[in-house]
């Protein structure tokens, strides 16, 4: 039994490890996610995230050519942020925004390891590559509860600005962006999202693949907290929808998803933030929904101009946001 396996046995009280399965390798060759099956002790299985931080020169090449010192530094910091999330914040989450608890973590030199609860063993066995209606609603309910709970919480040890695509962290993609009206609007879009008065913690990478679902898909739990930090909840909603829509839905259909999110947000705010005006949060964020989508579009169009997420639906939302910018700046930035 090696040192790593010994630690798992110690933390879980298991007698032996019966199987180790690689679930996935991490983006860019930074490590692996493993399911470790156990005999005896408190847990049938745990998930370990093992991260080996290479020097910049040793990394695997990015398939789109976006290999820069900045992207490498962002990735390294993201694992430190995730460590902080699991040590300081994960235990604050409740069943309505379920996350795995961290049973143990270790950081030595260029290597890090988290031992996490296995969500599959806790009633969330389903990872989906294609969404169901129930899963879409469950993911939005998770986000609403999470955003309400962490409203106005300081992102201590997390990203000062959550998400992996925000403007300050993506100068290279902005430089090559061909859409001039979006390029000119980028600063105002960013300003509205970061300076409106309702800031929460955002998951930062809330795509479908980062959720696990119950057998019925009625409830969700989330993983992968590398880009968690301060932000407007609409950023998570835009990214989540970008990962579940076919972009052939009617606008009324998408509207039902948004209504569901805002209904859940209202009831969660009443629970977690009774002193806040929930209706004002909803009104403000509703106006920022197209702005958050335009913000993501700015990244995608610079990063991969032929990406399938660039389509009439997302272009129309982006144009809508750009046309609303002057009025929204007057309304949302002056009344703080």
Give a label for each model feature:
Residues 122-203, 212-215:
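ATP-dependent phospho-/nucleotidyl transfer catalytic cores
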Residues 71, 84, 230-271, 292-311:
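Active-site activation/catalytic loop segments of kinase-like enzymes and analogous catalytic loops
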Residues 1-109, 214-220, 334-336:
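Conserved NTP-binding catalytic cores of kinases and kinase-like/nucleotidyltransferase enzymes
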Residues 272-292:
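All-alpha amphipathic helical-bundle segments outside canonical DNA-binding/catalytic cores
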Residues 102-106, 153-166, 272-279:
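Short, glycine/acidic-rich hinge or "gate" loops at secondary-structure transitions
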Residues 111-122:
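Conserved short submotifs of the Hanks-type protein kinase catalytic core
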Residues 286-336:
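ATP/Mg2+ or Mg2+-diphosphate-binding catalytic cores
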Residues 32-38, 42, 47, 189-235:
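Active-site acidic catalytic loop and adjacent metal/ATP-binding pocket
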């Amino acid at each position: 039994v090696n040192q790593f396996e010994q630690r798992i046995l110690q933390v879980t009280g298991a007698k032996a490890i019966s199987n180790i399965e690689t679930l996935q390798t991490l983006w860019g060759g930074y490590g692996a996610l493993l399911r470790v099956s156990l005999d005896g002790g408190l847990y049938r299985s745990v998930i370990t995230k093992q991260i080996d931080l290479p020097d910049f020169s040793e990394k695997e090449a990015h398939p789109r050519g976006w290999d820069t010192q900045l992207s490498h530094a962002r990735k390294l910091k993201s694992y430190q942020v995730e460590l902080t999330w699991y040590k300081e914040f994960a235990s604050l989450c409740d069943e309505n925004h379920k996350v795995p608890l961290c049973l143990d973590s270790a950081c030595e030199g260029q290597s890090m390891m988290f031992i996490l609860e296995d969500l599959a063993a806790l009633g969330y066995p389903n990872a989906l590559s294609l969404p169901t209606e129930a899963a879409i609603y469950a993911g939005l309910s998770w986000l609403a509860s999470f955003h309400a709970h962490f409203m106005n919480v300081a992102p201590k040890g997390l990203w000062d600005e959550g998400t992996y695509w925000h403007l300050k962290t993506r100068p290279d993609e902005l430089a090559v962006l061909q859409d001039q009206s979006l390029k000119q609007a980028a600063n105002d879009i960013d300003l509205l999202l970061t300076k409106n008065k309702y800031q929460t913690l955002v998951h930062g990478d809330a795509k479908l693949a980062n959720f696990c679902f119950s057998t019925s898909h009625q409830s969700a739990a989330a993983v992968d907290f590398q880009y968690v930090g301060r932000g407007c909840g609409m950023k998570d909603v835009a990214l989540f929808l970008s990962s579940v829509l076919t972009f052939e839905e009617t606008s009324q259909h998408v509207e039902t998803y948004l209504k569901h999110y805002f209904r859940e947000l209202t009831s969660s705010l009443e629970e977690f933030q009774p002193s806040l005006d929930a209706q004002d949060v909803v009104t403000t964020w509703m106006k920022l929904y197209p702005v958050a989508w335009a913000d993501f579009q700015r990244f995608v169009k610079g990063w991969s101009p032929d990406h399938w997420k660039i389509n009439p639906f997302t272009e129309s939302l982006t144009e809508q946001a750009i046309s609303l910018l002057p009025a929204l700046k007057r309304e949302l930035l002056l009344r703080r």
